[in-house]
Amino acid sequence: MARKMLSDGELNKAAAAGEEATTETHYDFDLFVIGAGSGGVRAARFSANNGAKVGICELPFHPISSEEIGGVGGTCVIRGCVPKKILVYGATYGGELEDARNYGWEINGNVDFNWKKLLQKKTDEILRLNNIYKRLLANAAVKLYEGEGRIVGPNEVEVRQIDGTKISYTAKHILIATGSRAQKPNIPGHELAITSDEALSLEEFPKRAIVLGGGYIAVEFASIWRGMGATVDLFFRKELPLRGFDDEMRALVARNLEGRGINLHPQTSLAELIKTDDGIKVISSHGEEFVADVVLFATGRIPNTKRLNLEAVGVELDQAGAVKVDEYSRTNIPSIWAVGDATNRINLTPVALMEATCFANTVFGGKPAKADYTNVACAVFCIPPLAVVGLSEEEAVEKATGDILVFTSGFNPMKNTISGRQEKSLMKLIVDEKTDKVIGASMCGPDAAEIMQGIAIALKCGATKAQFDSTVGIHPSSAEEFVTMRTVTRRIAYKAKPQTSL
């Protein structure tokens, strides 16, 4: 949540005052960063490259995070984006093997899936990346401390080391980059459930899985486990999963999940979990009973700020525990800053990297920079994936100052016509009729994330629908549909409600 922003002039004055103070006060570091995830490492390296003396602390490495373990690389590298994507790749091969038969591949005998082998490969990769991040810090002359950091003053950080000893360091600037952690709802028997942390490191593959949640983590793990052969039941509170995404895309994702064999339970929660000899008995909010080998709670994440001593120092937090910052990522304490999930702005790794880069440029690069949150693309790596950039149809109508034009293309991908898989792709463009600018794009289908990255550049540059139309497509490809949608699917009059075709 943003607090009152400093103007560029105020920021420069504050920076000048800080420089003045530096001549009178000696600090151990120009910058001390708490948290060596994507945002923290980026801020540390770029600040050091600008001449700053930088220290950073991070909890000891472990695939499953807790209050006392973590690891350089943070959630994305160790227990988030990277290991999850590896499992998505692994799960996708199941369907690919089925589809291969109609492409002439004779697959004789049983095709077995070895969960433990994939798990080991995943662990090897995150260890490799963990070491790369450490080398990046070392190469930038950033001093890395292993231990838990907490702020004990406007310019002082205390690090509790592995052996329990505490060492304090002073710094002209302190950056909070501690990320977020998974949370569990307080349902009876909740201790029997796991979060996404544990889901990435299960010793045994679950043959029966129940997932509670309707967000991207929930649908991704449902897709992963189903793709690997598990029976999966997905429970969520709304009528459709993926609240906040385009409704038409949400409906297609739901159909695809069901088409892949996932049992959907909309407008349903879990009431109780009970340990039995046969597994975990799950009672739904409608009184139905299920049995599972694993129950995943994918019900949101909270800022990882509880143990930082922020309130004692006077740093303002919102009700969820997120650090309040201005447009430059500065807190109400001039020497303390925060980036990434700890601020609960847009909780994506590339956004944390952007915020960290802006921080380094502002504080040590002499170039005050504000993070730009417009047209941030994102993807949900369900199978097949969903990717979006800009406004959904619903958001466009809400913010409209004139009529909105919606262009859609739904089709069976060329690959599916031979394999026989009945799974449509859908592409969508939202256009402001008054300016002809494309203000939103969505795609659900194979390679959606790879395609959407290019579309995001176009939206960032302010591309018009006419410019899309004048672009020559790559044929045959799914991507060419984005430049061949000539006919308006529907026009939404100013102040009207969106109407989807589903």
UniProtKB/Swiss-Prot annotation:
GO cellular component entries: cytosol; mitochondrion
InterPro entries in the record: FAD/NAD-bd_sf (IPR036188), FAD/NAD-binding_dom (IPR023753), FAD/NAD-linked_Rdtase_dimer_sf (IPR016156), GSHR (IPR006324), GSHR/TRXR-like (IPR046952), Pyr_nuc-diS_OxRdtase (IPR001100), Pyr_nucl-diS_OxRdtase_dimer (IPR004099), Pyr_OxRdtase_I_AS (IPR012999)
Domain of life: Eukaryota
Details of cofactor binding: Binds 1 FAD per subunit.
Cysteine disulfide partners in this protein: 76-81
SUPFAM superfamilies: FAD/NAD(P)-binding domain, FAD/NAD-linked reductases, dimerisation (C-terminal) domain
Binding site for NADP(+): 214, 217, 220, 237, 243, 300, 379
GO biological-process terms attached to the record: cell redox homeostasis; cellular response to oxidative stress; glutathione metabolic process
UniProt keyword Disulfide bond present: yes
Keywords, alphabetical: Cytoplasm, Disulfide bond, FAD, Flavoprotein, NADP, Oxidoreductase, Redox-active center
Cofactors demanded by this protein: FAD
Protein location: Cytoplasm
Ligand binding (FAD): 38-39, 58, 75-76, 84, 149, 341, 349, 475
Purpose: Catalyzes the reduction of glutathione disulfide (GSSG) to reduced glutathione (GSH). Constitutes the major mechanism to maintain a high GSH:GSSG ratio in the cytosol.
Protein name, as recorded: Glutathione reductase, cytosolic
Native source species: Brassica rapa subsp. pekinensis (Chinese cabbage)
